[in-house]
């Protein structure tokens, strides 16, 4: 009765309870005695006998960083447990080393003033954006009640004052509105699914950072969408040297969400490694630079990049890489990142959720690549060529992965190589007039992507670029290749398409022959690379100098969420701490 009374009183004292120092000292003595006994066995050439599996490890083998794995240990050396939720286990600890355990509780980091700083900054920015959008944007006149068309189910006798020309105007407005609803809304819906679900689930590859990935994916889309509406209007008026209010329709929405996907590509290089305040700085900076690059290349130079091989994939990958090399330039940070290998921060469940996101991206890639097409025939070619390219990349990814792994498949090769064909064809999908060429491009891209994932990713890791989501290999390299292939198809158009049709359809009434256009396309590639890399370096330095926040451990949901969602990640040298008796929220 006395023992149970003591345990109950101990639980009622507060949320946390801990083992006494006497018990810790007893554990230390038991382990020292066990080590002496093992040394005697070794001297007698007998196999050592261990009291538990964890004791098979030497102290040097099981050391792990405290911030990475065991933030539940306080400076006094006492190990804390949430009372009433986990069974207390015996621990030996010198600050970072657990020797006897099958369960660990993770204590949430203390609240930081920077958490409140993020909320206040975000509120101020939202108020500013709402004010700007309300002031600078107007309804499209086709959707305004003043210009709405006559309902066909009502008698025309009620409109005796209308002339035939008025009825024709109303009828044309009705047809344009109907086309926008049937065409552009479907594209807008597909791009939203690809952005929210595709990229969101793709970024759940890290098991301890899945909640952060989905949350910041949603936040970045919503926040960057508003920023892109504003900056697109500013740069469009600047390059046209005139001012007019923005129009709210599906076309402007598609361009805004298109740029948001560029930001999602960049976040693959820094997700789980930066604070939420740094996220805001990076979203604002990249929204400005991506809008500048898009309007410069599209409005001023009239570059053909229908699916965004330059605007989205190349720009996003290079920008994310440049920000990474600045923020993690120090050797200490890069050595810390080496502990987070793909084998230790992923598991079967996180890989399964990642492949769900990739399946969504494969399904909606044709809509994404055709979203900026200028005409229906271009949109038709974009859909067909994109699907053919994805088929080719999937087939070649399976084949090459089997060759490199003795007939077996590597999940990473299949994951990221499968949709790389949609990236390489994205820039030239509207000017590729041979469907077999799209299939061939997809197969070549799948082969290169798998080979680079097998060998080049190791080289990146040795140089300190810890690219979990492979943004350079999957988005950067195929995007650059696709951008250089586009001028080849454009240069060949003089043999395949009449010049008049080419001028009207492909260049939006701009008189320019195909060879001049091919040269400008190459110039646009270097402009995009320069803006992305120099801008990423500059933004990285500004983010670092401003000290916008610091996180205690990488790939950790507990950094930003009030409840511990993630499982404890340990080094490969440590015994697996998962147990069948663990509660479901700990597993």
Predicted regions and their residues:
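Hydrophobic alpha-helical transmembrane bundles of multi-pass membrane proteins
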Residues: 55, 80-587
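Intrinsically disordered, low-complexity cytosolic terminal tails
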Residues: 1-102, 573-587
């Amino acid at each position: 009765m006395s023992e149970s009374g003591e345990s109950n009183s101990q639980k009622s004292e507060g949320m946390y309870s801990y083992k006494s120092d006497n018990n810790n000292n007893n554990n230390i003595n038991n382990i020292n005695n066990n080590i002496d006994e093992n040394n005697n066995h070794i001297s007698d050439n007998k196999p050592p006998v261990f009291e538990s599996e964890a004791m098979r490890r030497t102290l040097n083998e099981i050391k792990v960083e405290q911030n990475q794995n065991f933030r539940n240990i306080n400076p006094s050396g006492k190990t804390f447990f949430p009372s009433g939720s986990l069974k207390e286990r015996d621990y030996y600890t010198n600050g970072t080393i657990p020797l006897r355990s099958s369960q660990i509780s993770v204590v949430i980091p203390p609240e930081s003033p920077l958490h409140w700083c993020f909320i206040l900054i975000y509120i101020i920015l939202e108020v500013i954006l709402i004010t700007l959008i309300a002031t600078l944007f107007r309804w499209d006149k086709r959707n305004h009640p003043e210009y709405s068309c006559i309902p066909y189910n009502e008698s025309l006798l009620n409109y005796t004052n209308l002339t035939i020309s008025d009825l024709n105007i109303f009828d044309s407005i009705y047809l344009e509105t109907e086309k926008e609803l049937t065409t552009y809304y479907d594209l807008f819906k597909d791009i939203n699914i690809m952005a929210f679900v595709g990229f969101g689930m793709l970024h759940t590859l890290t098991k301890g950072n899945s909640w952060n990935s989905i949350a910041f994916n949603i936040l970045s889309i919503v926040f960057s969408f508003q920023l892109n509406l504003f900056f697109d209007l500013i740069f469009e008026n600047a390059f046209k040297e005139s001012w007019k209010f923005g129009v709210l329709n599906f076309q402007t929405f598609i361009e805004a969400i298109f740029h948001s996907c560029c930001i999602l590509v960049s976040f693959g290089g820094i997700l789980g490694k930066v604070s939420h305040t740094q996220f805001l700085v990076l979203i604002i900076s990249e929204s400005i630079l991506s809008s500048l690059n898009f309007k410069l290349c599209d409005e001023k130079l009239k570059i053909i990049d229908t699916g965004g091989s330059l605007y989205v994939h190349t720009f996003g990958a290079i920008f994310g890489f440049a920000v990474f090399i600045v923020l993690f330039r120090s050797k200490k940070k890069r050595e810390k990142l080496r502990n987070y290998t793909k084998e230790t921060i992923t598991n079967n469940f996180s890989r399964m959720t990642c492949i769900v996101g990739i399946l969504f991206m494969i399904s909606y890639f044709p809509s994404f690549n055709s979203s900026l097409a200028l005409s229906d025939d271009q949109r038709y070619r974009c859909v067909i060529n994109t699907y053919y390219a994805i088929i080719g990349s999937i087939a070649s990814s399976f084949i090459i992965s089997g060759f490199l792994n003795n007939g077996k498949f590597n999940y990473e090769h299949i994951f990221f190589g499968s949709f790389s064909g949609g990236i390489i064809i994205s820039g030239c999908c509207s000017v590729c007039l041979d469907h077999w060429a799209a299939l061939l491009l997809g197969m070549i891209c799948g082969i290169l992507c798998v080979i680079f994932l097998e060998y080049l990713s190791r080289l990146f890791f040795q140089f300190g670029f810890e690219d979990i989501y492979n943004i350079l290999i999957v988005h950067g390299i195929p995007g650059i290749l696709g951008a250089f292939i586009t001028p080849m198809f454009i240069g060949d158009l003089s043999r395949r398409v009449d010049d008049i049709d080419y001028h009207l359809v492909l260049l939006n009434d701009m008189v320019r022959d195909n060879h001049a256009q091919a040269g400008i396309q190459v110039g646009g590639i270097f402009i995009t690379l320069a803006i992305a890399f120099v801008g990423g370096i500059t933004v990285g330095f500004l983010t670092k100098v401003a000290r916008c926040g610091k996180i205690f451990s990488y790939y950790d949901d507990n950094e930003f969420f009030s409840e511990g969602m993630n499982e404890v990640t340990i080094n490969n040298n440590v015994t697996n701490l998962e147990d069948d008796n663990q509660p479901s929220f700990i597993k």
